[in-house]
Amino acid sequence: MRGLVVVFLFLSACTLTLEVVYPGHRIAGLRTQETYCTAGNTRVDFAFDLEGRLDKVEFFWIPEGLTPDQARLEERYALSGPIHAGRVKGWLEVTPEGEVLAVSLTSPGSLSLRPQGVIVEPLPDRRLWLRGYTGGLAGPFVRAANWVRPDSSPSCDPAW
């Protein structure tokens, strides 16, 4: 009995601390092509580097000068993953009026995510923003390094 008391006192002096660490993800280097056509639909290409893995990514196709928290419901869209680490590339198909017809992306080690559509209000200059999710936890908003402007030239052919 005395031995159990000694063991109990020893164990009560010891503590075990478990810390749950969010594995996280990091989106960096988000860029888009610089123009879209005003005479027809354009696939606005984008690319970014992903560290970690995403379960979902949100897209914000908003007027230049606004932030994602100001985006209206129709200006945002989410694609479910998984989206694997590495260089991620994709496109948003937009009309001259600013409507997003589809979003698609591919990441290393996964099949492309099927195009899905959303409609946005027509505004000329826009910027793409992203936010990734891992394990249901939202990461920070990531702003594209450049904004996208309309091109009304008759030979419009946006290059990546």
What are these regions (language model features)?
Residues 14-160:
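Non-catalytic macromolecular-recognition regions in eukaryotic signaling proteins
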Residues 1-14:
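Sec-dependent bacterial lipoprotein signal peptides
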